Amino acid sequence: MKIFDTHCHIADPAFDEDRAEVIARFRESGVCRANVVADPCEEEPNQEKVFSLVEKYDFLCASIGAHPHNASRYDAAAERTILEYLNHPKCRLLGEIGLDYHYDLSPREVQKDVFDRQLELAWERRVPVQLHIREAHGDCMDMLRARLAAGRMPSGIMHCYTGSWEAAKVYLDAGLYISLSGALTFKNAPKLQEVCRNVPADRLLIETDCPYMAPVPLRGRRNEPAFITNTLAKAAELREISPERMAEQLYENALRIFGLRDEV
């Protein structure tokens, strides 16, 4: 059984003490690929650490972008860094980018400007995006509809999706994949479970978003890629198929959107 963790933060300081062991555990669990996220606009930019890590392991790839929390720090230098790393052979996506109105760590208008700018970069470079949208689906949908109307909408992924099925249909119509995290296993997630049941088989992905969002029965612990098997099992249960068939479909989907071949 092959599993692709499409969004993780294993370069995070939370893993500094045991990163090699974490990687060994997820390889043993069936996770044979993982995407590691970089952000040049963090207070401590991590792109060098991320890309050093993915260069070390052939089964890792990377994405890079300015998270909406960090939109206020996006400038010409950050954009140059993103464009530089998009040329890296192991960089597959631009992200995570988007809108986060839960914390409002950057002003909303700044978030929207930076989000739209990065969508444009992705369109120009013909790379998929990885979107982080929290409590901002209305504005996000408006922006994506405008890009669709202009014919400048990149392909991509709704990362760690927690919205409704009605909203998911809009994102699917925009050509995006829906990626589900450990939140799928939570007891208070009936709407998310409805999404899992209904997303077309060829547009569904899973991820850990570790070290956050650990699934039941591990909720509250530091999350890691090996825990994704719990999310996989829940997705298979909801879709009434075997975990093996679920893993196969999800893996095929991930290879497709990441533009990778099954060589690891």
Language-model region placement:
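Mid-domain alpha/beta scaffold segments of enzyme catalytic cores
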Residues: 1-264
